[in-house]
Amino acid sequence: MTDYKEIATPSRTKEILKKHGFSFKKSLGQNFLTEPNILRKIVETAGINQQTNVVEVGPGIGALTEQLAMNAAQVVAFEIDDRLIPVLADTLSRYDNVTVVHQDVLKADLVETTNQVFQEKYPIKVVANLPYYITTPIMMHFLESSLDVAEMVVMMQKEVADRIAAKPGTKAYGSLSIAVQYFMEASVAFIVPKTVFVPQPNVDSAIIKLTRRATPAVTVTNEKEFFKLTKASFQLRRKTLWNNLTHFYGKDEQTVAWLKESLAEAEIDPSRRGETLSLEEFARLSNALEKNKPV
């Protein structure tokens, strides 16, 4: 059909919202993108083709879903808002390679759902415009699940994207940077201005590209304790590593001796700040803490 207008065009978005009497829920962080060229750029950045299976979160009225469906083998989209299920059934009716799952993605068994939907064992990529209020939990849900995700190309608040891709010694670097970079290689692909959304958010967005590492960035003896340590090291932002560690682990004699011994073994100066430590240094310290842990 030559007169077909893509979902993301401003006029078609308006038409769809009016037809279904849809009103935005602020609590769900709903902002719909109305610029097809940006959506095509997202699909291009993710390298989506007929040998790619895609998981999307929060499809909204299906603007990005449509672009994914045009290029991917199959798409499974998780939508929590029951008001959008009939909208998506309408807007995506021409695409038979899309499955909309009416569920909170954080409660979903990602492996089971994708196994049921995807007919071919193609690489899985996560491509989504993530709701601002729940960006980090959704990302960590995918990273910590046993779903084999080759790549994530997701839109989020620019500030969060900067934190994820941040390098040691920068203001944005923190436990989130480490948690993501442990599993993935991270880079900000491009910026999306706030003016291309309905309703318009208060801040600009960014597309971040995360590529799964063959093995984690560093070798740690206890992954859970490693992440606990990195979180602890940034609790008191402008304090030294020593202040943070004693604040988190305790100041009793045995704990202090354990921390001192481990820091010395890892060759890390306790007067440094957490944001100056690289992933390798955190791994060294985590392994020393694990090795010297009081019985």
From Swiss-Prot:
Enzyme class name: transferase
Please give the InterPro entries that the UniProt record associates with this protein.
KsgA/Erm, rRNA_Ade_diMease-like_C, rRNA_Ade_Mease_Trfase_CS, rRNA_Ade_methylase_Trfase_N, rRNA_adenine_dimethylase, SAM-dependent_MTases_sf
The Gene Ontology terms for molecular function here are: 16S rRNA (adenine(1518)-N(6)/adenine(1519)-N(6))-dimethyltransferase activity; RNA binding
Would you tell me the protein name for this molecule? Ribosomal RNA small subunit methyltransferase A
Family to which the UniProt record says this protein belongs: Belongs to the class I-like SAM-binding methyltransferase superfamily. rRNA adenine N(6)-methyltransferase family. RsmA subfamily.
Keywords of the record: Cytoplasm, Methyltransferase, RNA-binding, rRNA processing, S-adenosyl-L-methionine, Transferase
Domain of life (superkingdom): Bacteria
Question: Where does this protein come from, organism-wise?
Answer: Enterococcus faecalis (strain ATCC 700802 / V583)
A single GO cellular-component term from the record reads: cytosol
* UniProt KW Nuclease keyword: no
Q: Which PROSITE patterns match?
A: RRNA_A_DIMETH (PS01131), SAM_RNA_A_N6_MT (PS51689)
Q: What does this protein do?
A: Specifically dimethylates two adjacent adenosines (A1518 and A1519) in the loop of a conserved hairpin near the 3'-end of 16S rRNA in the 30S particle. May play a critical role in biogenesis of 30S subunits.
Recorded catalytic reaction(s): these are: adenosine(1518)/adenosine(1519) in 16S rRNA + 4 S-adenosyl-L-methionine = N(6)-dimethyladenosine(1518)/N(6)-dimethyladenosine(1519) in 16S rRNA + 4 S-adenosyl-L-homocysteine + 4 H(+)
Residues recorded as binding S-adenosyl-L-methionine, renumbered to this chain, are N31, L33, G58, E79, D104, N129
